[in-house]
Amino acid sequence: MLQPKRTKFRKRHKGRNRGLANGTDVHFGTFGIKAVDRGQMTARQIEAARRTITRAIKRQGQVWIRVYPDTPVTEKPLEVRMGNGKGNVEYWVSKIQPGKVLYEIDGVPEEAAREAFALATSKLPLRTTFVTKTVM
């Protein structure tokens, strides 16, 4: 699963998921899926969607993951009283803003790409839309 090899600090403030997205255009592939909602994706969700896409296109073409889980999320164990410090890092998330391209595909027909992305979207916690590369 995706997670940083090393970070300057182990734990991070929760923060707020506001603002505009970077990476709003299909850059590497021909087709992609773009987030419509604001939210966060865990490393497990990113990997599950990647596997679904790879299997749906039968390992043809190429897949790019445009999001990376770089924010640690901590949790305290069950039945532990409040206080006594911040909990342990349990998983990593990527904060997603509307318009962010999540995955890209190249080397497959459009219909196969649409089908693969439709299957992958069911694994994700936010709504997405299908986008194609615009050539100027």
Swiss-Prot record:
The keyword rRNA-binding applies. Residues 1-21 are annotated as: Disordered. Transmembrane segments: none annotated. Signal peptide: none annotated. Keywords: Ribonucleoprotein, Ribosomal protein, RNA-binding, rRNA-binding, tRNA-binding. One of its GO terms (biological process) is translation. GO terms for molecular function: rRNA binding; structural constituent of ribosome; tRNA binding. Residues 1-17 have a biased composition (Basic residues). Pfam families: Ribosomal_L16 (PF00252). One of its GO terms (cellular component) is cytosolic large ribosomal subunit. Part of the 50S ribosomal subunit. Binds 23S rRNA and is also seen to make contacts with the A and possibly P site tRNAs. HAMAP family: Ribosomal_uL16. Belongs to the universal ribosomal protein uL16 family. This is Large ribosomal subunit protein uL16. It comes from Buchnera aphidicola subsp. Acyrthosiphon kondoi. The lineage of its organism: Bacteria, Pseudomonadati, Pseudomonadota, Gammaproteobacteria, Enterobacterales.
